[in-house]
Amino acid sequence: MVKELELRKEELANETIETIYFGGGTPSLLSKEEIETLLKAIHQNYKVIENPEITLEANPDDLSVRAQSRTIFEEYKLAGINRLSIGVQSFFEEDLKSMNRAHNSKEAKECLTMATRHFDNITVDLIYGVPNMSNERWRENLQIAFDFGVNHISSYALTVEPKTVLDSFVKNGKYPAPDETEAKEHFDILVAETAKNGFVHYEISNFGKPDYFSKHNTSYWLGKKYIGIGPSAHSFSKTHRSWNIANNAKYIKELQEGNLPNESEELTKEDQFNEYLMTGLRTIWGVSLNKVAEEFREQLVTSSKKFIDEGLLIIKRETKQSASSLSRCNEDRVLKTTAKGKFLADGLASELFIVK
């Protein structure tokens, strides 16, 4: 991975790194020394702002075992990590077993107890729409997270991915399929309870207290350029998307031979529009009509009209200060989801896609 960082430094030669994210796989298995090695390579090959957001993804079962020495969180902090993303999913044994998670309720709570002693910037993942999860248990799940004092929650509806253990269980009648009506009820509870506890619903699946939004994911949602390092990692610029090969042995071999182990595709204007629409509609910032290519602007306004009439979307007029002049303001029209439309954001975006 250090070799890939070195080979790709020209891609961001004119950019400044603001966030670093250790995610995918099980990055929490990295030692303090391995994290330091990667961060050193980033600082040596790229321009990095002072105090960038550096997030590490971790699961409770990994952390609770390694935290027995009570040093793992201190080591992460010393290595440079300043934000933790912990895949709790649920604080209840029944849910964790049904989702085939490796950790249990006790480990989830122990992990957060230790983590909050060393980090104040922590996000937890929670899953809703789990069959047999009552509305009351979902409220309790959220309350436990609030009681731990976490400042950010990422929450997603349970989905059954093809060719997974859960998929097999559902097909064989061993596990009920998720119910969309229940998921919608849980989503409404999630929105209401997080708001009561001072969280801002700034992206469909993300809730943060002021100053604790995920800077890394926000950059992604706002269409900023990023590069992904390691097998299967994806990268994005406004006009291109690339992805690394998944096979570890082939990935290493290509780099040893001085080759970049990736494939790429050029994004058409339609692709760029659809990408912006999909991410923009999920956020509180919406889709700026000023940023939409002129050739697609009126088509978007026209095609969104039926969803506006149904109370799912709204176009708001906003005044923003000009970046080039403090005395000048720019008028903009911004397409956003309404409270009623939030749960349907992805479906609404796909209905508005431009397909050639």
Describe every region a protein language model picked out:
Residues 2-11, 15-296:
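C-terminal scaffold of the Radical SAM
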Residues 58, 337-338:
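Hydrophobic residues in beta-strands and at strand termini
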Residues 66-71, 316-334:
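Intrinsic disorder/low-complexity segments
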Residues 295-309:
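Short amphipathic alpha-helical interaction segments
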Residues 308-318:
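A short, conserved structural fragment
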Residues 340-356:
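Short, amphipathic alpha-helical interaction segments positioned at domain boundaries
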